[in-house]
Amino acid sequence: IKHPFFGELVHACEDETYRRGYKLMVVASDYNEEKEKRCMDILRRNMVDGIFYASHFLSREFLEALRVPAVTLNNEFSGLPVIHSDDVQGGYMAARHLIGKGCKRMVHISGQQDLHLSADVRMTAFVKECERQGVACKVYSASEQMLWDMEYMPLINRIFMENPDMDGI
């Protein structure tokens, strides 16, 4: 929840559930599998009406055993509804926006590549669009630890030192 994307997502979900007469209960496991199981048990004991699940540890069988409707975010479970972001289109849109603003020498900051996140395809689309339009683009990867600590300054300082003529991030 501490990552800005998920904070915004929780805020939007809370607004919508309130509008529909429900309360929102939020639990966070910080990518700890055991903590995630305990969080799900808390939800089960509180007899929630449904679960919006944005993680990758638990199995479809575990979610079904909770006996409440579940929807997942970017996580395919056979038989469960899933909400997908269009990361390819997002990458193209971001590149086109910056190119439309006049950027010619860009840097893309991505997540750690070996984690195989959905954001990887967004980065690939961004780079492809830059190449297609003849715009220079360097890719820098933030480590998984940077993502969770939200500590990007060393990487940002390095990017500015190595790319003094950069005009878009």
PLM regions: where:
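Central regulatory/effector-binding core of bacterial HTH transcription factors
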Residues: 15-60
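N-terminal winged-helix
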Residues: 1-15
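Phosphate- and divalent-cation-binding pockets in alpha/beta enzyme and binding domains
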Residues: 5-8, 35, 61-62, 125
